[in-house]
Amino acid sequence: MPLPNNYEYAGSSDPNHGNKYRMLSNEQKDLLALALTYGYPNRVGLQTSKDANACYAATQLIVWQITLGFRTSPTELNDKSYPVSGYSGTMTEQHCRNKYFKAYYDAILADMASHYIRPSFAVNYAGAAPVYEMEYANGKYTLTLTDANGILSKYYVSQSSGVSVSVSGNTLTLTSSKPINDAVTIKLNRQIPVTTMSTGFLIWSVPGKEGANQDMVSGVPGENDPVPSFLKVRTAAGLSLIHI
């Protein structure tokens, strides 16, 4: 994705001297990471060249909005760009008149906005995880939890602590053949999209010729936050059975 030429280089013989990315705030870097995570070419389901082109252009615009300081969150934008000669509206308004572009633009921003939403029954810290009780029935201990936030389908189980755990839509089902007297931790992580074109995070520039070239950014930052989410389970008190 091209980065706008709104930052100056300090000038150095060191090929790693570019400071455009370094000059971004931490908030901008976080937003940029999300845009690249859910945008082109990391976005899953690009079936045609029309899809790829629209997704590429939408990702590029969002990157520009972030690095120019126009976008402060997935839902907050103050586009201060001027209309191109012969056209009306801001840079964002002009691009969003194309329905194919707008579809991917909206989808990328929606995924960015929901990235840090956790299932309603889980929290972000294991030490504060709520404890749920599994009930005994039909020879096993079970528990079913429904996610009121509607985001569970975008998570996977990364730690089960010996409990059988499955995700189906917005329903989490936990099963154990043995009693669990001391609560154990269940950990869920956000699914990060990956395609055959996904790469590591890179900033591209031409050292010594920065003024005549536009910097590029590609790939997905390796420190992408999987949004770990925690809950704990145990078997209901008084229901521990002696197996002979």
What does each of the following model-derived ranges do?
Residues P119-Y125:
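Long amphipathic N-terminal alpha/beta scaffold segment
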Residues S218-S229, T235:
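Long, compositionally biased, intrinsically disordered
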Residues Y125-I151:
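Solvent-exposed, low-complexity, repeat-rich "mucin-like" stalks and linkers
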Residues N181-V206:
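Short, aromatic- and glycine-rich surface loops/edge beta-strands on solvent-exposed regions
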Residues N170-T185:
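Extracellular/luminal low-complexity segments enriched in Ser/Thr/Pro
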Residues M1-Y116:
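Short, surface-exposed polybasic-aromatic patches that bind anionic ligands, especially phosphate groups
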Residues I242-I244:
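Conserved small/polar residues in nucleotide/adenosyl-binding loops
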